[in-house]
Structure formats: C-alpha cells, structure tokens
C-alpha cells in the first residue's frame, strides 16, 4: 500500500460521477478485470494506491456543484478494503456526500460496509443510496479459491438482508460466470434464490463472462494452472 496526494477524485459528468479512493485491490480475485493493462496501472495491483486527500478533494468539488447527482465508487478498487477499517476514508467521503445531499452507490464484496449503515440510511432518506454487491458462487470452498480474501457468500447475503430491512435498495452483480467452475444451473439458481430472499432490486450480469484482456487473462490462466490443472 502506498499513499498519494491526488489531483482529482471525481470522474464523469451529468447525472452520475465516479470516484476511486483506492486504486488496486487485495481481495485476490483471480478473475478481476481491473488488472487489465488497459487501465494503465503504474504499480503492482496489490500495492494499493490510497488517495489520502480524497475527502478534501470531494468536499471542494461538491461545494461547487449546483446539480445533485449519484456518485458511484468501487470500479478500480473496493471502497471497503481491509485498510478502510482503520483509514476511514470512505466513511469521511460518505459524511461529505451526506452533508451536500448527493446520492451514492458503492460496489463492494465486503460486509465492512455495514459499519456505515447509519450514513447510508441518512443519505437514502435525503437523496438515494444504492448498495451494490458481487456474488459469484454458493460453493464456499470454490469462493476461497477464486476470491480468497473476501467475505463468504453467506456473509455478503446477510449484509444484503440487513440493507433490505433498513429500506436501502440493493443490486447484485452476478458476475463473472466462469466456465466449468461456477456455471452450473444449481449455482445460478442458488445465487438467484439468495437475491430473492434479500429482496434485491436488480441483478447485473454484465455478459456474465470475463473480458480476458491483457494482464487479466494471464493472471486468470495462471490461477487455473495452479488450482485446476488442465482446465485452461
């Protein structure tokens, strides 16, 4: 992990913006598209870049904006990485989003997001908060292989139910579907059953498969060779 003083935080325009407080990830997911060379990481993917001045940048930007909109986060790094537990940069950004009455939609695989349930509830009451979470497999043993450092599917499903009970809408990313690993009808039906039970408002499949772009492809194939010899 390394810290930087970023020059900017928000990207996008119009009705929706994005931000990445963390760039890179320590979840270790073998299928992660964010490893792709097209994103031009100048550091090792696991050496997470932390924008330590993110709250200050967000405050300065939102203070100038007259039109309220949604702010998404989590495309280039989970906003609730283990480091967030101590750094609290995401929480500080949520406080700013709440203060300026903007909406927010974080994408995560971590139930650490429950720490910020109070802020997300407040934002949802004034603007809109939509929690997005990725689910890939009902097989916890497989999950430990393909996404080794994230919460279990059971723990993530529990978090979704808690948000449901708090009236905060949720969306599930049912992706990726990995050939010969989690592509069974039993698995897809099991994940959909968890979504129904949690009352999610939408399911995103994003084509279901992987992009297999440069760097992402090599990392995934190496993982297949280690854990599932001959499958590649």
Language model region names:
Residues 1-132, 140-144, 153, 157:
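Conserved Radical SAM active-site core
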Residues 155-215:
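Conserved C-terminal portion of the radical SAM core fold
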Residues 117, 144, 183, 215-217:
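Short, well-ordered secondary-structure micro-motifs
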Residues 77, 110-112, 135-139, 176-178, ...:
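Active-site-proximal loop/turn and secondary-structure-junction residues that shape catalytic pockets
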């Amino acid at each position: 992990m390394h810290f930087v003083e970023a020059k900017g935080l928000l990207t996008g325009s119009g009705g929706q913006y994005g931000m990445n407080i963390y760039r890179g990830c320590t979840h270790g997911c073998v299928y992660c598209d964010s490893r792709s060379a097209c994103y031009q990481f100048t550091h090792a993917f696991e050496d997470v870049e932390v924008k330590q001045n993110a709250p200050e940048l967000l405050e300065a930007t939102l203070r100038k904006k007259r039109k309220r909109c949604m702010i998404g986060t989590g495309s280039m790094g989970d906003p609730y990485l283990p480091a967030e537990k101590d750094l609290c940069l995401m929480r500080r950004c949520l406080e700013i989003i709440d203060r300026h009455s903007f909406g927010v939609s974080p994408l995560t695989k971590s139930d650490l997001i429950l720490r910020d349930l109070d802020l997300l509830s407040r934002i949802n009451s004034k603007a809109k908060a939509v929690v997005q979470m990725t689910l890939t497999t009902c097989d916890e043993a497989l999950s430990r292989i393909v996404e080794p450092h994230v919460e279990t599917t059971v723990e993530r499903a529990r978090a979704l139910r808690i948000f449901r009970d708090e009236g905060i809408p949720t969306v599930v990313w049912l992706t990726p579907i990995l050939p010969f690993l989690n592509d069974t009808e039993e698995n897809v039906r099991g994940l959909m059953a968890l979504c129904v039970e949690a009352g999610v408002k939408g399911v995103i499949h994003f084509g279901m498969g992987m992009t297999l772009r440069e760097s992402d492809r090599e990392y995934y194939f190496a993982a297949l060779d280690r854990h599932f010899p001959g499958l590649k």
